[in-house]
Amino acid sequence: MMFLTQLVSALFLFFLGPISYGKPVETFVLPLAQDAPIPPSEDPFYQPPPGYEETEPGTVLRQRRPPFPISLFRSAPIDLAATYQVLYRSSDTFGQPTATVSTILIPHNANMSKVLSYQVVEDAAFINCAPSYALQLHSDPGGLFGTIIIQSELLLITAALENGWVVTIPDYEGPAAAFLAYWRAGYATLDGIRATLASSGFTGVDPDAAVGLWGTSGGSVASAFAADLHPKYAPELNIVGAALGGVVPSITTALHSLNKGFDAGIIVSGVIGLSKEYTYMQPILESYLVPHLRDKFMSAGKKCSGAVSLDFRMEDIFSYFKGGEESGLFADPRVKAILDHNAMPQGVPEIPILILKSVNDEISPISDTDALVEKYCSNGVTIDYKRDLLSVHTILAVTGAPEAVLWLRDRLDGITVEKGCKTSTIFMTLLQPGALEVMSKTIIDNLLNLLGKPVGPRLRTEIVHVPPL
């Protein structure tokens, strides 16, 4: 088995294309004997070249084929027509130059004029949890069940690939894993789309492709910020719609919902992530941490979300701070300002938006999303808001996926949506017209993908050229 693993690794590395800085081409060599991908914290591919700061946002700084194949649950490679990773120039929260990576998945029989930007639920303050790494065969999960959510999301992503769409997956938290820094996430998402469209010379993606946005939970907020920032930051992009599931408009409200729950660790990762973006928060955090609890708290910065959730499950996170809930870290006006800066909305989208939300959402109360929709609608945004009576936050990510796929399919097919706002309270999103059919097909496709079926529609949706390996 080890020999087979090394043989597969060697073949992938042999066919790995040169890595370019734009003009001069640098050959990127990895050791053939490695049996797992190098994590981002150690991989030189993730380090931008000198002078990158002078390039425009969305510029491709470097490109490669992933060292290891994209795989279901880190163990079962899926058969794609091609996969690329691009390091590209972006902007941080404060508009300063930064660089991050997006992974571009091209299905068999792809329609290169349709692109989906999928924002995963990373929810971690550790760079080695980034999807560009986590989705590769034999990646380290960053603790027990660390990247299990990202692994599971590949099952949803394949539903998009089976429609023939090119899927780009940005590492929207950036090189420091600034979880909850959603301005950065929005910029990284938009610049990831720019980079994907600019990759046409080596990927074959149509530079004028129509683009959809999709994300659930934390990924939905990154997608929403991209929609908010799109009109001013990247108005040239032909984004045709955004599907948001389980959106979390207010971090402050979510803190109280998460505390003492199974996912209380999200609070810990969020605090560490924000302190990486807003560096002046670091000494503030240190001043509030209870000394004998500090090491455990900060250990979350070296683990991925599933492992952090296990470490802090059912704990009172406010007790980690001097002053507790009443006068601790989150009562500090400097920290409250940071949380408010990353609340929604932060702009007025010009694209139609589908919002799916559980009435019984245990992480972010439905009232927050009701208020968000009201703000959007009062500013003329076209919204289709569906309130699901039966689901909870996590379940909606699965049961709402078929509705998101159907809605995005119409947008990418050029079917216009009626302007204005529409709110409906439904029994279950999965019972919407066509949803069960999509769910059934997705389950069957994923089972067949595990058996080696080429990922993509059976009939070619457009004659395209995918550069050979």
Curated annotation (Swiss-Prot):
Compartments reported by the entry: Secreted
Reaction catalyzed: a triacylglycerol + H2O = a diacylglycerol + a fatty acid + H(+)
Pfam family, one: LIP
Active site: 217, 361, 393
GO biological process terms, semicolon-separated: lipid catabolic process
Glycan-carrying positions: 111
Chain positions covered by the region annotation Disordered: 40-59
Signal peptide segment: 1-22
Stored InterPro entries: AB_hydrolase_fold, Lipase_secreted
Main location: secreted
The protein's Enzyme Commission number: 3.1.1.3
Domain of life: Eukaryota
Disulfide feature: 129-304, 377-421
Segments of skewed composition (Pro residues): 40-51
Listed GO CC annotations: extracellular region
Keyword tags: Disulfide bond, Glycoprotein, Hydrolase, Lipid degradation, Lipid metabolism, Secreted, Signal, Virulence
SUPFAM superfamilies linked: alpha/beta-Hydrolases
Function comment: Hydrolyzes triglycerides, with a preference for substrates with short-chain lengths (C4 to C8).
Protein family membership: Belongs to the AB hydrolase superfamily. Lipase family. Class Lip subfamily.
Name of the molecule in the record: Lipase A
Organism in which the protein naturally occurs: Arthroderma benhamiae (strain ATCC MYA-4681 / CBS 112371) (Trichophyton mentagrophytes)
Lineage of producing organism: Eukaryota, Fungi, Dikarya, Ascomycota, Pezizomycotina
